[in-house]
From Swiss-Prot:
One of its GO terms (cellular component) is nuclear speck. Residues 16-37, 207-219, 514-523, 542-563 have a biased composition (Basic and acidic residues). Belongs to the SLU7 family. This is Pre-mRNA-splicing factor SLU7. GO terms for biological process: mRNA splicing, via spliceosome; RNA splicing. Its main location: nucleus. It comes from the Eukaryota. Residues 220-233 have a biased composition (Acidic residues).
Amino acid sequence: MAAEAGKASEGMVDLEEPKKMTREDWRKKKELEEQRKLGNAPAEVDEEGKDINPHIPQYISSVPWYIDPSKRPTLKHQRPQEENQSKFAPIGDWYKRGVQEKSVNTKYRKGACENCGALTHKKKDCLERPRKVGAKFSGTGIAPDEHQQVQLSMDYDGKRDRWNGYDPDEHMRIVEEYSKVDLAKRTLKAQKLQEELASGKLMDQANSRKHEEAVQDHSSEDEDEDKYVDDFDMPGQNFDSKRRITVRNLRIREDIAKYLRNLDPNSAYYDPKTRAMRENPYSNTGKNPEEVGYAGDNFVRYSGDTISMAQTQLFAWEAYEKGSEVHLQADPTKLELLHQSYKVKKDDFKEKQKETILEKYGGSEHLDAPPRELLLAQTEEYVEYSRHGAVLKGQEKAVAQSKYEEDVLNNNHTCIWGSYWKDGYWGYKCCHSMVKQSYCTGEAGKKVVSNSCTPFEEDVEEAQTSEEPKTLLQMHQEKLKDKKKKKKSKKHRDSDSSDEEDEAKKKEKLKKALSAEEQRLKQVAELMQVDERKRPYNSLMEVREPTEEEMEAFRMKRCRPDDPMASFLGQ
């Protein structure tokens, strides 16, 4: 019995509490750990025969009692547990498509749909037409069971796999289709060559040199494709051989990308996200920015009102340091007016300072001296003239002249051609003539043109739009409409007069309320100056709801401390 009890105890896991270690055992354990860390003693081995790293801390390597009470050295509790891992479908599984439903059963089965007899759904989910006598009672026309698709659980990569469920056999069908098309093209070409050979055209054409080039082009693959397209329509292709449309690329090939202007990696930085190159790419090459077609995008930062806004912001900071409460975003109007007045005063101060210095020391005659070119009668500026005196090259820019003749008056005209415009045509202003190179007719021509502008069609339209005779019914309906209009206009006049009276009464009430509010504010100001102990009490016997006019007067006279312009009300 004792041996059996010992064997049973060996098979069972020791669930006793851990005994307290002695000092000697604790010292030996620590020495063994140090030896293992130094590599002088073999490392611990888990149940799978793998070495346990001795440098792993104890709080990681020790096994909780509720996971493995055997206290064996292991790291299994730190590894992912297989029973808790989610299982995903293999790569070959996918939904079956095109499964044919065949009705094999001829008898009704228990638990099937009472309407059609299929086992995959119930009567309330049946999509067939409700039968007069269901399959449960008739036993005929048993519908086939729907194919139940497999439930696939895909992992992260499987859900995003674009080739998931792809069948390579589908591509083989396309290859077979193109092979059939190629075979048909070859047979057509062979038949056509046989017909030309039988008719004798091929021998005549072979003698000429032009036909040799045509045969070479004819044998090329591109010619075969064009020939096939002319005769057939490719299955699955939307191509019309009767109208061929060629779309040209409208991009200008002469333009240069920003990042290709200077290939030096130390030159201006190109931001590919915003497609911006702020600095000048030709800065290190020594070229003048004015002579270069592109000098960077930094010029946009200084365009518009950027410089004036920066000057205003600088003025606001300087004024704030000197005690003025101004802000560019909070008080833009006030800051702008203050800045303008500062500029005017600054200019006046400079002028006065200049005048006082000239009055004190003199020398105003030197400021009014003629230019240096007139004094020395020579300059270092290069100017090139033509034989006719026109400026070709130099400081003064030559005026561009038109290639057409200007201010040419011919055929007695006093105005040039194009000085008059009417109804989409150009003409002469002097005689209103629309014919170029015509002779001027003066005021007589203007009268003729003005008289000829009265069309005959207007008289015809007026004759056509003459009033037709009206019936008695139409006349009666028009009278009723006139009466209704008169009644409406009379009511509208009465309502307008009443509205004007109401507005006048409201204005009078508002004036009275404003005067009463002013008196109340004066009384409040007087009471606030009196000592608190001497102020009278407020009686609640006369409390009533204020009228609309009194509320409006209170709002108009109320002082708002948060109003930025409140400080200017007393000025």
